[in-house]
UniProtKB/Swiss-Prot annotation:
SUPFAM superfamilies tied to this protein: Glucocorticoid receptor-like (DNA-binding domain), Nuclear receptor ligand-binding domain
Region of interest (Disordered), residue spans: 129-184, 390-411
Keywords for the protein's UniProt record, in alphabetical order: Acetylation, Chromatin regulator, Chromosome, Cytoplasm, Cytoskeleton, DNA-binding, Isopeptide bond, Lipid-binding, Metal-binding, Methylation, Mitochondrion, Nucleus, Phosphoprotein, Receptor, Steroid-binding, Transcription, Transcription regulation, Ubl conjugation, Zinc, Zinc-finger
Position(s), cross-link Glycyl lysine isopeptide (Lys-Gly) (interchain with G-Cter in ubiquitin): K414
Classification via PANTHER family: KNIRPS-RELATED PROTEIN-RELATED
Protein name: Glucocorticoid receptor
Feature: DNA-binding region: 416-481
Organism: Cavia porcellus
Cross-linked residues, Glycyl lysine isopeptide (Lys-Gly) (interchain with G-Cter in SUMO): K273, K289, K697
UniProt GO molecular function: DNA-binding transcription factor activity; nuclear glucocorticoid receptor activity; nuclear receptor activity; sequence-specific DNA binding; steroid binding; steroid hormone binding; zinc ion binding
Zn finger residue spans: NR C4-type: 416-436, 452-476
Subcellular location: Cytoplasm; Nucleus; Mitochondrion; Cytoplasm, Cytoskeleton, Spindle
């Protein structure tokens, strides 16, 4: 039977809810959606009969019998309710969360008032599986289905008459409680429809829940009245990341054959949570889908006819689906949406694209409808506009503000470490200007004894550097300027150039025999290796602005000595042949000679930088006569000045200094000897010969070579006494805790190990000359 004929056949079924007149329609789905208001007319015969009968019954029962007038099997109540809510529950053990919705017991729907809400939905669904069979007689269905007597809620005659008066006075409006006679207390809203026999889920084409049976010319069951409403057309939307939900449209038929009726999205739908793995479709429009983190894009496949043709296109912005036919998703892309029956949306995951601009260019949907241009949003009934940007955040007409770094033309100029003038280069081992270079050279070679008129703290800058030569010279020494640094650099550079030139000539003429003039030009000597491994000058970090005191100076000297000992250990390990000794022998030699190395290096720096008049412990710590006058300072400074004065008197060269310093490392041994004594004697003799070569190189083939060798070796022997006196002062300071002089950890360990050996006389001095 056709839909229109089944609905408009009022002669066959006079008491049907689905009447031919629109004013007699009861919006059953509005009740399911959350309200319970029943719109009736005062002239309705069924309602009039309901008002005059059954004064004892208080609740209105709506029954869904299993059989209809055409003997067609009716859908179950749980499915009907679920379909009207936009969801299907495969099992009856379902928990409904959200709004307070419920059904009464035994599959009954009670409408006690115009604003009835279903409070017993959960119990009703749970009891549906245990409900008894419903008789085919619709008139007796109320007593058969309901397990309780109808006289449970008696009413008086006065209450019935008052309700009848209220009903008549409120005809055509949402009135109060509506009563029905016992013969019409249950509404079989589907018994007048002629359906084919069998379950509605058996055949999709014969399903009684098809939307074409629910939509007629007068929009029978839809809250949206209107013949030209585009949302009442058939269609299937497959949205990016989420299916589109349209109100009162054709439901999606799932694989199990059960029809699902999409509900109107004018009322928020409840959330459904089940405990079993059943198929549930939750149609909840207006919910923002939580996207995964990361630049992953969803792409939907659209097929079939458009929802409304070319009249309206969906908007796609930021992952929100709305009820007005608009879809929102990422990337500002628009496309016409189409819908195909019995087909789920196809989602494709596009992998992340590295380049930001390519993400906009390559993100597109598949289907018959092509996407519009990038950054374009189309609204129905409006002209198309575009933002004109190829990528977000990049605007061609707006330039980024200039940064502060762009205004600078280049890196800041480097300054002289002495006077803060513009730097001209590296002079005597320090980055200085040309003026300070010339000043330092003249001050050292001229052997001037500058004196400061103030407190040796004059300001040295570009303007006032000529005011005090003493402070300027002191600042040059503190920066680390040394005349010998330039000579050493030239020598090392010459050796490298000679070696490179020989290798190039050999590669160009491999068959040519090269006869070197002298052997040292080809093979680096031990002296040249000693020049390379010589440790750099270490700064002390002494604060010259604070008042001087014995405690501050001696503590600073001890800390500086600890760092110099560490540098001396590295230097000793780099000496050719030293690492071949036994490890215990290496440690013993370093413990016995650390004060020799410190005192001799101090004398050399003082001799080269101040001509032996000052003690240059570090570039930032120079002991002058004023500081020498402090308590406990004069005695040890006097011994140290002796070394620098002897170097000045003998005019020791740098090669001679390097050889003598190595011999001082090998100048003291234990009385019982070393574990590798033979190797030690061989190494020591090798460097004695190197000292002779350095003397010959300086003096030439002269008769004074042996005399100079005697003078230099005599100086080495005299250092044993000088170092012995310095060690006595150091030991006394270390043992006297009242002075509160600090010692670094490594230096304290060496002194602790060395004290008993010196006190017992277990040290053997290796002298060149007998006394």
């Amino acid at each position: 039977m056709d839909l229109k004929e089944s609905v408009t056949s009022s002669k066959e079924v006079p008491s049907s809810v689905l009447g031919s007149e629109r004013r007699n329609v009861i919006d059953f789905y509005k009740t399911v959606r959350g309200g319970a208001t029943v719109k009736v007319s005062a002239s309705s015969p069924s309602l009039a009969a309901a008002a005059q009968s059954d004064s004892k019954q208080r609740r209105l029962l709506v029954d869904f019998p299993k059989g209809s007038g055409s003997n067609a099997q009716q859908p179950d109540l749980s499915k009907a309710v679920s379909l009207s809510m936009g969801l299907y529950m495969g099992e009856t053990e379902t928990k409904v969360m959200g709004n307070d919705l419920g059904f009464p017991q035994q599959g009954q729907i009670s409408l006690p008032s115009g604003e009835t809400d279903f409070r017993l939905l959960e119990e009703s669904i749970a009891n549906l599986s245990r409900s008894t069979s419903v008789p085919e007689n619709p008139k007796n269905s109320a007593s058969a289905v309901s397990g309780t007597p109808t006289e449970e809620f008696p009413k008086t005659q006065s209450d019935l008459s008052s309700e009848q008066e209220n009903l008549k006075s409120q005809a055509g409006t949402n009135g109060g409680n509506v009563k029905f006679p016992p013969d019409q207390s249950t509404f079989d809203i589907l018994k007048d429809l002629e359906f084919s026999s069998g379950s509605p889920g058996k055949e999709r084409s014969e399903s009684p829940w098809r939307p074409d049976l629910l939509m007629d010319e007068s929009c029978l069951l839809s809250p949206l009245a209107g013949e030209d409403d585009p949302f009442l057309l058939e269609g299937n939307s497959n949205e990016d990341c989420k299916p589109l939900i349209l109100p009162d449209t054709k439901p999606k038929i799932k694989d199990n054959g059960d029809g699902i009726l999409s509900s109107s999205n004018s009322v928020p739908q409840p959330q459904v949570k089940i405990g079993k793995e059943d198929f549930i479709e939750l149609c909840t429009p207006g919910v923002i889908k939580q996207e995964k983190l990361g630049p992953v894009y969803c792409q939907a496949s659209f097929s079939g006819a458009n929802i409304i043709g070319n009249k309206m296109s969906a908007i796609s912005v930021h992952g929100v689906s709305t009820s007005g036919g608009q879809m929102y998703h990422y990337d500002m892309n628009t496309a016409s949406l189409s819908q195909q029956q019995d087909q789920k949306p196809i989602f494709n995951v596009i992998p992340p694209i590295p380049v930001g601009s390519e993400n906009w260019n390559r993100c597109q949907g598949s289907g018959e409808d092509n996407l519009t241009s990038l950054g374009t949003v189309n609204f129905p009934g409006r002209s198309v506009f575009s933002n004109g940007y190829s990528s977000p955040g990049l605007r061609p007409d707006v330039s980024s503000p200039p940064s502060s770094s762009s205004t600078t033309t280049g890196p800041p100029p480097k300054l002289c470490l002495v006077c803060s003038d513009e730097l001209s280069g590296c002079h005597y081992g320090v980055l200085t200007c040309g003026s300070c270079k010339v000043f330092f050279k003249r001050a050292v070679e001229g052997q001037h004894n500058y004196l400061c008129a103030g407190r040796n703290d004059c300001i040295i800058d570009k303007i006032r550097r000529e005011n005090c030569p003493a402070c300027r010279y002191r600042k040059c020494l503190q920066a680390g300027m040394n005349l010998q640094a330039r000579k050493t650099k030239k020598k090392i550079k010459g050796i490298q150039q000679a070696t490179t030139g020989v290798s190039q000539n050999t590669s160009e003429n491999p068959n040519k025999t090269i006869v070197p003039a002298t052997l040292p030009q080809l093979t680096p000597t031990l002296v040249s290796l000693l020049e390379v491994i010589e440790p750099e000058v270490i700064h002390s970090g002494y604060d010259s602005t604070s008042p001087d005191s014995t405690w501050r100076i001696m503590t600073t000297l001890n800390m500086l000595g600890g760092r110099q000992v560490i540098a001396a250990v590295k230097w000793a390990k780099a000496i050719p042949g030293f690492k071949n000794l036994h490890l215990d022998d290496q440690m013993t030699l370093l413990q016995y000679s650390w004060m020799f190395l410190m005192a001799f290096a101090l004398g050399w720096r003082s001799y080269k930088q101040s001509n032996g008049s000052l003690l240059c412990f570090a570039p930032d710590l120079i002991i002058n006569e004023q500081r020498m006058s402090l308590p406990w300072m004069y005695d040890q400074c006097r011994y140290m000045l002796y070394v620098s004065s002897e170097l000045k008197r003998l005019q020791v060269s740098y090669e001679e200094y390097l050889c003598m310093k190595t011999l001082l490392l090998l100048s003291s041994v234990p009385k019982e000897g070393l574990k590798s004594q033979e190797l030690f004697d061989e190494i020591r003799m090798t460097y004695i010969k190197e000292l002779g070569k350095a003397i010959v190189k300086r003096e030439g083939n002269s008769s004074q070579n042996w005399q100079r060798f005697y003078q230099l070796t005599k100086l080495l022997d005299s250092l044993h006494e000088i170092v012995g006196n310095l060690l006595n002062i150091c030991f006394k300071t270390f043992l006297d805790k009242t002075m509160n002089i600090e010692f670094p950890e490594m230096l304290a360990e060496i002194i602790t190990n060395q004290l008993p050996k010196y006190s017992n006389g277990d040290i053997k001095k290796l002298l060149f000359h007998q006394k």
